């Protein structure tokens, strides 16, 4: 059976999440969906999967049901297919933020950060500058272990372990961004959107977010100016620029990404350990 995987997020002020939670949970269970939906005062973030019929019904529900007062009428979904269900259960959770930065929740009504679409970004990278002649710098907002799987050529990577470290590293490295057009990017768009909004709020000029993140870029223009694969937070571990699962796996013990090369190491035992485990053990 073909399973449809949906991912979506939207920054919008919400104040009825406690009332919505049981109703959304019940509807998802009726449709046989699995995955996670996060609701927070700043918006919604979701990863769900099910049959085509079920996911189509969910999209219609979340966009058009009067319960939501049109808050999600423009919610855009990213879709991929798999041969099996990647999630074990259905959860609807209430959170302080839909992506944790440990900063006061943003106010979506004040306006999102400017975005650049995949084709425009590719043309900038082809030329080495934006349409005004300003040099372009790519800023990776993901965690270090994700970056190691793949990233844009010459991207800035501050080796953060969690997204809440982003404001601090930006404050410490503002000089890297001055006089340039900064394009923040992440897997699907949510972190780079919040990162771009934060940079805009602290006075960094000429900041854009990559619309739809790396996965949308792959969908639109392939792997141009990108090396490696894109880590994803499900059983597939990583997708290549053709949006196909790769041979990368996640270590059962330490959750590190294990490349095909690392899987040939004597330290790799499927379901038990990997070279990263061995290195950590030897350093202890």
UniProtKB/Swiss-Prot annotation:
The active site is at 186 (cysteine persulfide intermediate). GO terms for molecular function: oxidoreductase activity, acting on paired donors, with incorporation or reduction of molecular oxygen. The keyword Nucleus does not apply. Transmembrane segments: none annotated. Residues 132-226 form the Rhodanese domain. Gene3D superfamilies: 3.30.70.100, Rhodanese-like domain (3.40.250.10). CDD domains: RHOD_YceA. InterPro entries: Rhodanese-like_dom, Rhodanese-like_dom_sf, TrhO, TRHO_N. One of its GO terms (biological process) is tRNA modification. Keywords: Oxidoreductase, tRNA processing. It is an enzyme of class 1 (oxidoreductase). Its EC number is 1.14.-.-. The keyword tRNA processing applies. Pfam families: Rhodanese, UPF0176_N. It catalyses: uridine(34) in tRNA + AH2 + O2 = 5-hydroxyuridine(34) in tRNA + A + H2O. SUPFAM superfamilies: Rhodanese/Cell cycle control phosphatase. Belongs to the TrhO family. Catalyzes oxygen-dependent 5-hydroxyuridine (ho5U) modification at position 34 in tRNAs. This is tRNA uridine(34) hydroxylase. It comes from Burkholderia cenocepacia (strain ATCC BAA-245 / DSM 16553 / LMG 16656 / NCTC 13227 / J2315 / CF5610) (Burkholderia cepacia (strain J2315)). The lineage of its organism: Bacteria, Pseudomonadati, Pseudomonadota, Betaproteobacteria, Burkholderiales. The gene is trhO.
